[in-house]
Each structure stands twice: as C-alpha cells, then as structure tokens.
Amino acid sequence: MRTPDNDLPPPPDRYTCDGDAAVEARVARDQALIAAAVTRILTPPRFRALVLMGGYGRAEGGFVMHEGQPAPFNDYDYFIVVRGMGRAERAALEQTLARVSLELKGKVGVDVDFALLRDESLATADYSLINAEMLWGHRVVAGDPRVLAAMPAMPFAGLPQAELTRLMLNRGSLLLMNQRRLEAGEAISGQRLEIFFKFLFKAARACGDARLAGNRRYHPAYLTKAERLAGSDVAWPGQAEFLGLYDQAMEAKFHPRLARYEAAGADPRAWQGRMVQLWLDTLAWFEGVRLGRPIPDWEGYAAPTLGKGQGRDTLALPGNLARNLKTFGPLGLLRHARWALRHPRDRLISALPLLLANPGAAASPALADALGIAAGSPWVAASERFLDLWRRYS
C-alpha cells in the first residue's frame, strides 16, 4: 500500500490507493463517461472544468470485486466550475444535473454528486475543510487543469476548528439515521446492514479527523491520519477502543467487505452504542479544545449562548437572521429569540448530542429550543425535525 508524503499532494495518475491496473482502468472509464455526460449539456465559455474530489480525487478511492471484476465503492463527488451564469441559469442547470446524476448512477454503480462552483468566486473562496482538501488533492477530468489556481492558499494547520465541528455534525447525523432504524424496530440485515456499518465507520473516521485537528495535526490523506493517530501520545478519551474501531473503518474504506459483519453475527445495537459513545466523547473533547473550556454536559452545551462557530463573523449575522426567519417563521423567532442570530447549523450541532445520548426520550427544553419544537415532543418527531433541518443546512 502506498505511503503518501506528509507534505506533497497525492500522485496525479491514480484514483485508488492500491488498486491494480484493472481497478484504475475501471475508474478511468467511469470518469470519461461522466465527463462526456457533463460536457454534452454544458459547453465553454460557461463550462470551465469538471473537478473530481473526495477519495478518488486524492488517489484514495475504494473498490470492490464483483464476480472477479472491479467496481467503485465510494461515491463520485464533483465540483463543476462555471462562468458567467446567473442564479436562475444555475438553478436550471442543477435540475438537469440531478437527472443526469441518476442516469449515471445506473451506469457506474455508485452515486454521482455534482455541485456548482462559480469561477468568479474562486479568488474569495471560503477557508473551509472541503475547499482545503480539494486544493490539496483533486483531479480535473475535463476542462482547464489549472482552474483552481485562483483560489487562496488554505493550509491545514490554520483551518478553522469549527470546520471539524461541522464534519462531526454531518457524520453524527448518519448515526442518528442508524438510531432511527433501531428505534423503529427495523430488521437490519443484508444491504441495510451494510449501509448501517458504512455509516458507523464514516463516523469513526470523522472522530479521527477531529482528534487530529484538535492538536493541529489534521491531514487529508488517510494513511497519514492513521500513522498520526497511532503514534500520538495525547490522552484522548477511549483511545484504545477508538484505534481498534478506526482500523476497521480504514479497512472498510479501502477494501469494504461489510457483509462479513452479518456473517459473524454482529449486533447492530451494540455496535451503534459503542460508536455513539465514542462520537460523544470525541465531540466533548474537541469542543472543549475549540472553546478553551470543558463541556459541562450536553444540556449546557445546547445553550444558544455557547457558539458552535458556524456563520463565524459579524457580517454573517443578517444572513443568519434571514435564515432563521425563513425556516422558523416570525412566531418561531419570537419563541426562540436567543437563536435568532445564530446560524441554523449551530442549532443542529447543539441538538444532535442530546438526540444520540438519549434515544427514545422526549425532547428536553434545551433540545426543543434548539429545534424550534415543543418541549416533550416524542424522540421520533424530534429526530425527524432534526434531519429535515440538517438536509437544508448541513
């Protein structure tokens, strides 16, 4: 398995970490197919580039074997860089791309996700985790290979720590989806079990990211992450159990064989409980580092006076107010006025630990306040409200 240099970007000629020529050729064929589909509906000068992100863009994509033939395992994630397109034109293009992505999924076997990036905004792009990782490792599969050169430098050592809080929110939300299946009494087997474990391991990898970022040791390459986590002398909570889970999560990313957990009689509820506790412990530690003080408890953490770092500057306050007004309405704003100037993501970050720590419990006043619902609302309703908001503001 290749060991990436800690400073240099990933090799530009690979999509996977250790796939053979047949694996690489399969992913390359998929890229050509997807590029052809995009360039049929979008042409220069409006089209600037199709940029492959994520694991395949960083030469760390996963693969599986089906009847002796390689196939991708992870989603294909792209930014499409466009120029000179107004809001209405971009909205229309997004609708077309949604249809195209479904067609492509049927051909390549994994989700194909597109997001638009305006060429005019590159020079002032946000200093975010997704942008920093994209700059470090990406593949331009169609268009100008230097399209991202206009973006400012985004060193990982200076990455705003609230970006990792956001990552923990997004991966913790997958744990909430798992918990809803358990609370509903669903039979978790077959493909459902594979998805269940896929979500568990995504959360485990996010915990690794947060633990590294809390010590300014974050790196996008998974092999480097694993080395830094294993070699750390930091007394992280639950470190021994975490490293065991992280090793399995790493294997599941590169060489997924999730069906083996069903064959071994794995108990989904027990696995979920372990992962939720590690997620809660990691979030409490990381947020204590970010805020410079310990987290007293999850009820106290949910207070709107404790900022979660989303919508980070004063200029964002009018936008935060507008988002809350649009989402919760004038009456909701009055009832939960302390949240009015916080980004809605702050509400979600505040609510999620309470939902995961107390599955099945009625909404406490703090949880209800964050989600804009009535105290005492059933857990199922509160979790559904959370996921509705998360899909809008993740």
Model-inferred region functions:
Residues 285-394:
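Non-catalytic terminal regions of proteins
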Residues 4-26, 95-215, 221-240, 254-328:
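Conserved NTP/Mg2+-binding pocket subregion across the NTase superfamily
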Residues 239-251:
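Polybasic, proline/glycine-rich intrinsically disordered low-complexity segments
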Residues 86-94:
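Short, conserved charged micro-motifs
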Residues 250-253, 375:
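Solvent-exposed interaction patches of small proteins and small membrane subunits
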Residues 2-58:
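Helical scaffold of the NTase/Pol beta-like nucleotidyltransferase catalytic core
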Residues 35-76, 81-87:
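Active-site nucleotide-donor binding segment shared across nucleotidyl transfer reactions
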